[in-house]
Regions:
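Hydrophobic alpha-helical transmembrane segments of multi-pass membrane transport/permease proteins
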Residues: 19-44, 69-72, 178-186, 267-269
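Long, hydrophobic alpha-helical segments
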Residues: 60-86
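Transmembrane helix boundary and interhelical loop/hinge segments in multi-pass membrane proteins
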Residues: 76-97, 110-111
Length: 304
């Protein structure tokens, strides 16, 4: 299987750059600071109690996991927002489109490069994360789920950045638009549910409310932490006792997490398709139509 040339080139350039070393160092430093601050907080809260302080160390896992997901979600759009618009600024976009690569290969190459870079950060943080498993006594399967969610966050953030980069000519504009789309997913997806609860009877509006939250990152991470740490569903607590078979099914087991993951993957794929469509060269049929219009305009001007 032939490796995507963009991935091969960009990963090599990033791996050899001093900037990458600095970014990994800063990332590790932030993770270490978060770990020690959380550790000091947990020990201070249990200093004057009879409980076992080590039983509370398990909460280091969600603290570090959420910190990393937030950093990845904030940093990746900055890198991917210049993937296409940066080529336009350097005036190399047309050269890139004349290569033998398809628009889809170009988009996937840029996205996979961003995901690979994110995984470098995640792998570099494993020693710090390992401390939470050793001290807190967690199963190592939690590490797998942490990496899986990190992959989802990276793909989702990268797809937003790539789509914005394909529409914008300036990288800074693409970054701003990317964070604007973030606000839509964080706030706008929760706002209809909140308004429904206020303006209507909560018991009658559960079905309408719950659908909006499938694409809310805060709800997704909260549900993941609740299932991981307490084996209880936060969504089930929101829904409460209901006679609706659909809502009971959503709140059972890991159904909500699975559906929400599928929804985020589908939206990410949609964003990538939009980006691919945006950078695709004009098709032959459209090119003929444009050529015909241009010839008509030239003829009219010459006759006029």
């Amino acid at each position: 299987m032939r490796l995507n040339p963009i991935i091969k080139k960009d990963v090599k350039v990033q791996a050899r750059s001093f900037k990458m070393c600095v970014e990994v160092f800063v990332y590790e430093l932030i993770m270490a600071l978060v770990f020690f601050v959380a550790l000091l907080y947990i020990t201070s809260q249990n200093r004057f109690t009879d409980g076992n302080v080590y039983s509370q160390m398990v909460w280091l896992y969600p603290v570090l996991a959420i910190a990393q997901w937030v950093i990845l979600g904030a940093v990746i759009p900055i890198h991917t927002s210049s993937a296409i618009s940066g080529e336009k600024e350097r005036q190399t976009f047309d050269i890139m489109m004349t290569t033998g690569m398809t628009p889809w290969s170009i988009i996937m190459g840029k996205v996979m490069t961003a995901v690979a870079q994110a995984m470098i950060f995640v792998v570099a943080s494993i020693p710090v994360m390992a401390l939470t498993f050793v001290v807190g006594g967690l199963s190592w399967s939690y590490l797998f789920w942490f990496i899986a969610v990190a992959l989802l966050v990276s793909l989702f953030a990268a797809s937003i950045g790539i789509m914005c980069s394909s529409f914008c000519r300036k990288s800074i504009t693409a970054v701003i638009v990317s964070y604007g789309i973030y606000i839509i997913f964080f706030v706008v997806t929760a706002l209809p549910a909140y308004l429904i609860c206020i303006l209507t009877d909560y018991a009658k509006s559960e079905k309408d409310m719950i659908g909006f939250l499938l694409l809310n990152p805060v709800v997704y991470i909260t549900e993941f932490v609740a299932k991981s740490m307490t084996d209880a569903s936060w969504i089930a607590d929101i829904i409460g006792q209901t006679k609706s078979p659909l809502l009971n099914w959503l709140a059972s087991g890991s159904v909500w997490m699975i559906l929400s993951t599928i929804a985020f993957l589908a939206v990410s794929f949609l964003f990538l398709l939009i980006a691919k469509k945006r950078i695709s060269p004009v098709s032959k049929r459209k090119a003929k139509k444009l050529a015909g219009k241009q010839m008509t305009q030239i003829t009219e001007q010459s006759n006029g």
